[in-house]
Structures are given as structure tokens and as C-alpha cells.
């Protein structure tokens, strides 16, 4: 079964935990291009439940923040969404936000032209929301804002949006406003990449629903990449249930050269064209076709546990970094992979027969180094490539950065 890879969901979580109150703030004024203040604009922090509204003079304040890198999102009816990255160090910051009016008529015409649009939207939903059990209770409320483009020659689907995508997650109890910057699904390389800025809102529900949502959130957080990097920052991966190995790619020395294989395939194809099925040349052709399908490289698992103090370095007070050559093979021992995931998802990675069906993710370093914050936020969206369980989990299994797991008694 084809295995899909996920380039680290980017710009999802670029900030620190809003639940751990700090003394800094981001303040500012929202104006139109004429300089007139805009009251009633929604101001959000990407990856959080933190939000406010501009007052009658267009002013706003987002208080209680810690040092870190924040993405401010602004939404106002009749205007295009606005984003601005703000870095807080040792003092609060004031910013001016200028938003532009939205023009939608042309986009509506373009949407109606493409006869394959619904097919592309369905593909996008599967690869953006995901195909986990939680995805069955997720719904995109405004798919009409999506703009699709398919490159037939390169077999790449691209999706963007000029407005917030609204995702209702009835599995976790969140309404997500997602400003989709970019989505690309490459059907040649099997790599999915998407970047965007989400804001989380709590859904209303009964007490029983909220209890169920809390249970599901605990499951979604446990073993996630956010959980891993948070524990990696605090040097507590072992206690949190993670085991880290290294996975190395080596040349498959038993594989014959492509030049020889291609020659043999051409030779026996020619001989078998007018032959009966029992002709020996058919068996030879099958043999060489199998040789063609043999992998050029093999994966070798080094089962010496990686010590986090050798993997992680501190570069700034609130920022740490990792840089490595071979892929990280990360096992989460407190949850198991389901049979459906292992056999049907197309994301499962190989494991030695003596390793239980722990949740396994493989993390490749694409653009070194990878910097990350205390609460699981990876700074550079294109630094890491996920396969395995983290490539399987997508928007349907996201929790906000200010999510705090329950304290479990020993």
C-alpha cells in the first residue's frame, strides 16, 4: 500500500502556551486603507483560543503573554483576512493593522467553471482533515471559499483560500477558523504539505458532550507531535512514554543496476510478444520486473535509544533546537495502533516483530535545524517531514496550544 508523507503542518503552532500567564501584551489599532479605525474586528492568536474584538476606536489588547513568536489574525466582514507575525522578547508591543476590502465576485465565477472541483475538494478534505475516526465528525462549513488548481503534468493539487475556512469538529468540541495559506498534494512523491493559521473556539454542548470531548482531547494530545516536542523541551520524553531510535537509509547492495534490469526487461518483452503463456521468456520477464520493483535503499533501525540531552541544544532562553542526519524513529508506548490504521491507512511504518504495536512516527530533517518552543511549537514549517502516525493525524486531531492535559494520579 502506498505510504503518504506529511510535511510538518506549518504555522499551526508558532507561539507559547497562553494558559501559562505572562506579563507581556500585544496591542494595536485596526484601520482600513483610508486610515479610518474599524470597530468590531475580530483579533485572534494562531493556534490558541485567545481572542478579542477592537473597540469603537479600532483599538485592541491581547494581554497575559509570555516571550515568543506570535501570529496575529484579524477578521472583519467585508475585508480580507490579515496576518502579522509578532515577536515578544522583554517588552510589550503595539502594532498598526491595515486591512483591505474584499472582492468576491470574480472568485465565484472561477469556482463555478471547474467541472472537477468537487473531486478536488473531496481529495482536499481527506488529506487536510484526515481520515482518522475523529475526521468522521468534522465538517468544513464553507467549502465555497476554497480555490483549487490541478497541475496535470506534475500531478499536483493545490488549494488556497482568501477567507477563513471554518471547520466544526464535533469529535473534540472545537470550531476552528483556519486561514489556509497553502495546500499541496503531490501524487508522484506522495508528499502532502499545507500551511495555515488556526484559531480555536469552544463549541457549546451538554455536560455529557463536554465530558466526551475532554476524553477525546486527551487521546488526541497524547502521543502527538505537540506532546513530543513539549516533552523534548523539558527533557521528559521517557517519562511521557516516548522512545527514540535512529532510522538509517543504506544502499540495497542486492539490487542489480537499472541499466541491466531495463535491458533484460526489453529483451524478454520482445521475445514474449508472440509466445504462449507457458513460454519460459514470460517467467524471465516477470523475474526482471520484480527486480525492477526492488527498493534501491533499505531502512536500518538502530535500537540504541537516543538520549535527549545529546539531541537537543538551547540556543536562546525560550528556544531549543535539534539537528540530526538519520531519521528519528519515535515510539509512543502509552497508546497502540489500531488494526484499521495498520492495515488500511497507508501510513503504517515497518517495525521489528518483537516491538508491540506502539504508535510509531518517523521524522526526517528536511531543512536543518528545527527550532521549537516550550509548549510544542516548531518554528520553521518546512524543517521536518512526518511519516507514520503523525502523518496520519491532521486537522481532525489538533488541539490548541493552550490545551493543558489532565493531571493523572499515580
Residue map of PLM features:
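Hydrophobic beta-strand segments
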Residues: 41-45, 72, 111
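Bacterial Sec-dependent N-terminal signal peptides
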Residues: 1-29
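Surface-exposed, low-complexity/disordered segments
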Residues: 90, 98-410
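A short, amphipathic beta-strand motif
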Residues: 24-32, 58-60, 97, 109
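A short, solvent-exposed loop/turn motif at the edges and junctions
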Residues: 45, 73-84
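Short, acidic Ser/Thr/Gly-rich low-complexity loop/linker segments typical of extracellular
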Residues: 48-59
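Structured interaction patches on ligand/partner-binding surfaces of diverse proteins
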Residues: 52, 80-95
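Structural motif
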Residues: 21-38, 234
